[in-house]
C-alpha cells in the first residue's frame, strides 16, 4: 500500500508530514507480543455471490468457504465477519446443506462443525449474509487510519452531482472481513470466485480474470471473476462504477486502466509505462509477472494513496491528471511502480504478520529507486533514494525496530520505518554484496516462498544461500534493531609523513555501535582510488599514504549509508 504521505513531494514530506510524534501516555502495548496468527483451519477456496444495494449501502452476499484443518484435528471454525447480519450457516454435502449451529458477536462468527475433521479432510461452509459496512464503521470505527468498513459506497444515492457513484474495497489490514466472511490474516491464502450483480450501466473489477458476463431480465448484469492462484484475503478486491476501460497488453496478458470517462484520452499517458515496468521487474527478479492480468482503477475519496490488490490495484483520484498537468510530468509514476512491484513482494510472497510488514513495503519502496535508475539514470535514482532516506531521518522514528513485535495498533506499522528505512536498508545490502548477488537472492526468496507467507528470517536465508555469507549481523543490526548511526568524520593530514588519517566517530545517543562497511574514495585530479574498510567501533581511524596531498577524501563514496553526519565537523591539518 502506498500511504498518502509517501506519495507527496520531498518538500511536504519533510516539512509537514513527518512531524515529531506525540508522546503516547498509554504504554501497556509495549508488553504485548504480537505473534503470528495461529493456523487452526486453512482457507483453500472462497466463492462469493454478491449484490450491492446502493440505496442502503448494503451488500447482500452468499459465501462458500472450503477449508481444512492446518494440522491438529478440529470440530470448530472461527471466522472474521464484521458488522454483518448472518442469516444462515450450513455445511455443504453434495447438493444438500446441513444447518450448523453458530455464535456471532458482530466481529467473529464461531461455527460448530458436524464432526471433528483431520488435516487431510476438507469441508465447505455456506453462509448467507448481509454486510452493512457503513453501520459497522459508525458503531466501531473510532479513529482507525483507513477505517474498518472494508467496502466504501461513494455517493451511493447520486446526491452529489459532481461526484460519480462508486464502490471500492480496502482490505488491508484486516477489513476484507467487513464485506465477506473469511479468516482475515496475512498467513492465509486461497483461490477465489466472485460473481457480482450490478446495474448494467456499471463496470466491475475484481481479482483474476473476467470469465463471463450475463445480462439479467431486471436490467442488471452478473459478472463472474475467477482467480485460480491463491492469495491473501486482505488482497481481495471489488470495484464498481462508471469507468472507461482503456486496454493495454503485456506478453499476451490483459493490462487495463479503469478511469473516469473524462480521463480516457490520457489514461495511457498516466499508466502507459506499466507494460515496460512489468518487463523490467520481471527481468530483475527473474520471475515473470505471475498473475493472469493486471488492472489499475481509480477510486473517489480513496482512503490511502494506492493499494496492491492482486491483479487489481486501486489508486486515489489524484492519479487522474489531465493533459495540461501531465506536461510537467506524471506525479503518479512512482506510485504506479510501487504498487506493481507489490504484485511480487506482498502478493506473490506475503508477509506472514504485520510485524514483518517491511517485507512487503521496503521492496515496493525500493522499486521506485530501481525504476528511476533504469528509466532516468543514476542521478535521478540517487535523488529519489536520498529523499526517501530524509523522510525517515526526519520522522522521529529512530527508536522503532524495522521488524517489531510490539506495537499499539497494526496500522502503526505503516510508517517511515517499514517503508523508507526498509528501502534504504535494501539499497545498502545491494551495495554491500553486489548487484548480481542481490538480484539472485531476491529471486531465491521469491521462488522459495512463492504463494506463501514469509518473515524476515526467510529473506536472510535466501541471501545467505546465494552469497555463502552469514548475514545475521546485518539483519540483527538493521531488521531487528532500531536507529541509525550518527557520525563525526574528521581528516588529519601529515604532509611530512605523507599520511592522511580518516577518523570516523559514532556519536549516536545509544550504547549501540553499528558495523559499517565503508568505501573511502581518494581523489587526485581525475584519478580515484577506493579503499574498502570496516567501521566497527565507537572510533575508527584509517590511514592513507600519499606522495601528494589528495584533492579530496570522500567517505561513503557512493553515498549509500543510512546515517546522519555531525554538522560541526572540522578538518585538522598539521605539517
Identify the role of each PLM range.
Residues 170, 198, 203, 221, ...:
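Non-catalytic accessory/interaction domains
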Residues 23-27, 86, 105-109, 225, ...:
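Hydrophobic alpha-helical and helix-loop surface patches within well-folded domains
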Residues 20-289, 416, 431-433, 449, ...:
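Acidic/His-enriched low-complexity segments
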Residues 114-116, 338, 545-547:
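Hydrophobic loop/turn residues within beta-sheet-rich immunoglobulin-like superfamily modules
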Amino acid at each position: 500500500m502506498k500511504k498518502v504521505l509517501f506519495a507527496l513531494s520531498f518538500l511536504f514530506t519533510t516539512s509537514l508530514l513527518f512531524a515529531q510524534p506525540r508522546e503516547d501516555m498509554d504504554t501497556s502495548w509495549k508488553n504485548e507480543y504480537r505473534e503470528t496468527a495461529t493456523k487452526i483451519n486453512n482457507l483453500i477456496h472462497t466463492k462469493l455471490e454478491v449484490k450491492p444495494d446502493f440505496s442502503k449501502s448494503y451488500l447482500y452476499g452468499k459465501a462458500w468457504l472450503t477449508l481444512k484443518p492446518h494440522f491438529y484435528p478440529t470440530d470448530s471454525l472461527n471466522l472474521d465477519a464484521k458488522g454483518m447480519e448472518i442469516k444462515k450457516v450450513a455445511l455443504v454435502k453434495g447438493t444438500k446443506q446441513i444447518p450448523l449451529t453458530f455464535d456471532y458477536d458482530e466481529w467473529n462468527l464461531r461455527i460448530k462443525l458436524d464432526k471433528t475433521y483431520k488435516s487431510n479432510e476438507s469441508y465447505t461452509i455456506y453462509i448467507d449474509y448481509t454486510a452493512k459496512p457503513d453501520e459497522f464503521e459508525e458503531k466501531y470505527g473510532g479513529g482507525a487510519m483507513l477505517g474498518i468498513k472494508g467496502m466504501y459506497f461513494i455517493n451511493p444515492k447520486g446526491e452529489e452531482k459532481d461526484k460519480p457513484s462508486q464502490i471500492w474495497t480496502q482490505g488491508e489490514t484486516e477489513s476484507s472481513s467487513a464485506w465477506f466472511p473469511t479468516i482475515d490474516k496475512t498467513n492465509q491464502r486461497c483461490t477465489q470466485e466472485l460473481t457480482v450483480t450490478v446495474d448494467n450501466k456499471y463496470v466491475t473489477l475484481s481479482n483474476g480474470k473476467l470469465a463471463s458476463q450475463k445480462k439479467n431480465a431486471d436490467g442488471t448484469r452478473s459478472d463472474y471473476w475467477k482467480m485460480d492462484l491463491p492469495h491473501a484475503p486482505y488482497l481481495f478486491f471489488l470495484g464498481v462504477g462508471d469507468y472507461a476501460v482503456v486496454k493495454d497488453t503485456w506478453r499476451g496478458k490483459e493490462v487495463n486502466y479503469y478511469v473516469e470517462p473524462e480521463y480516457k484520452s490520457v489514461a495511457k499517458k498516466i499508466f502507459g509505462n506499466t507494460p515496460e515496468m512489468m518487463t523490467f521487474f520481471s527481468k530483475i527478479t527473474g520471475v515473470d509477472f505471475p498473475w493472469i492480468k493486471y488492472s489499475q482503477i481509480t477510486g473517489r475519496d480513496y482512503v490511502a494513496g494506492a493499494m496492491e490488490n492482486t491483479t487489481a490495484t486501486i489508486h486515489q483520484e489524484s492519479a487522474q491528471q489531465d493533459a495540461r498537468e501531465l506536461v510537467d510530468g506524471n506525479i503518479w509514476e512512482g506510485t504506479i511502480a510501487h504498487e506493481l512491484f507489490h504484485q511480487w513482494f506482498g502478493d506473490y510472497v506475503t508477509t506472514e504478520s504485520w510485524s514483518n510488514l517491511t517485507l512487503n513495503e521496503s521492496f515496493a519502496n525500493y522499486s521506485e529507486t530501481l525504476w528511476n535508475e533504469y528509466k532516468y539514470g543514476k542521478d535521478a535514482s540517487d535523488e529519489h533514494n536520498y529523499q526517501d532516506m530524509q523522510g525517515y531521518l526526519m520522522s522521529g522514528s529512530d527508536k522503532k525496530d524495522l521488524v517489531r513485535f510490539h506495537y499499539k495498533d497494526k496500522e502503526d506499522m505503516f510508517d517511515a520505518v517499514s517503508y523508507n528505512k526498509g528501502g534504504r536498508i535494501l539499497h545498502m545490502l545491494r551495495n554491500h554484496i553486489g548487484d548480481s548477488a542481490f538480484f539472485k537472492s531476491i529471486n531465491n526468496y521469491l521462488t522459495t516462498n512463492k504463494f506463501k507467507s514469509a518473515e524476515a528470517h526467510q529473506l536472510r536465508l535466501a541471501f545467505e544461500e546465494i552469497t555463502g555469507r552469514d548475514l545475521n549481523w546485518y539483519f540483527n543490526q538493521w531488521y531487528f534493531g532500531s536507529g541509525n548511526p550518527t557520525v563525526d568524520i574528521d581528516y588529519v593530514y601529515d604532509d611530512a609523513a605523507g599520511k592522511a588519517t580518516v577518523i570516523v566517530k559514532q556519536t549516536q545517543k545509544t550504547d549501540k555501535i553499528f558495523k559499517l562497511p565503508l568505501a573511502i574514495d581518494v581523489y587526485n585530479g581525475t584519478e580515484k582510488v577506493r579503499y574498502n574498510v570496516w567501521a566497527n567501533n565507537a572510533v575508527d581511524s584509517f590511514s592513507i599514504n600519499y606522495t601528494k596531498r589528495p584533492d579530496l577524501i570522500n567517505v561513503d563514496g557512493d553515498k549509500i549509508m543510512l546515517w546522519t553526519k555531525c554538522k560541526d565537523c572540522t578538518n585538522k591539518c598539521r605539517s
